[in-house]
């Protein structure tokens, strides 16, 4: 397996930096030669946007039972796609990141961490009435920042800090990721 260094952003066996991950969340089109983890992360944001929209449709006033059932089926489909994308990230990690025996084991796979960050990215943007990516799924009303929006952004910042610490610990062989 290849040696990884935190902050490298190419597809040569290194984990993407937190800034590259956040840029991928915002972008809808991958740059040429984009890292496979970033492409999956970009798609996870889109899944979370679609999921949020489906829930809004199902919870709309006077939503018919057919509409609610359709939204439920759509959420199931989206969740299967999220699982596939998380698995793609985890397979890439297993194939490309050196795992040092004896290093502390992290409790989540990298795919699960990135999926959680993508979900919080979408929630934080929607709390401000902003689209989560450059390709919004629907128009959002402008909103005034409130305590809920602040909480989402603080939590996203905490997740970003945790991701940065995790990839640094992996690169320095202090932590290893579970391989499923």
Please place each PLM-identified region on the residue numbering:
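Anionic, Ser/Thr-rich low-complexity intrinsically disordered regions
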Residues: 1-180
């Amino acid at each position: 397996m290849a040696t990884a260094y935190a902050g490298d952003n190419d597809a040569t066996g290194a984990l993407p930096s937190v800034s590259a991950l956040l840029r991928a969340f915002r972008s809808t089109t991958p740059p040429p030669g984009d890292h496979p983890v970033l492409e999956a992360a970009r798609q996870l944001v889109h899944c979370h946007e679609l999921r949020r929209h489906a829930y809004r449709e199902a919870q709309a006033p006077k939503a018919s039972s057919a509409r609610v059932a359709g939204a439920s089926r759509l959420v199931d489909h989206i969740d299967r796609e999220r699982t596939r994308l998380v698995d793609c990230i985890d397979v890439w990690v297993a194939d490309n990141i050196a795992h040092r025996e004896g290093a502390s084991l992290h409790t989540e796979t990298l795919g699960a961490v990135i999926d959680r960050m993508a979900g919080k990215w979408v929630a934080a943007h929607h709390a401000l009435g902003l689209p989560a990516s450059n390709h919004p799924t629907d128009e959002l009303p402008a909103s005034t920042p409130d305590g809920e929006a602040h909480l989402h952004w603080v939590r996203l910042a905490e997740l970003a800090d945790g991701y940065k610490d995790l990839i640094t610990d992996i690169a320095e062989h202090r932590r290893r990721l579970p391989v499923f």
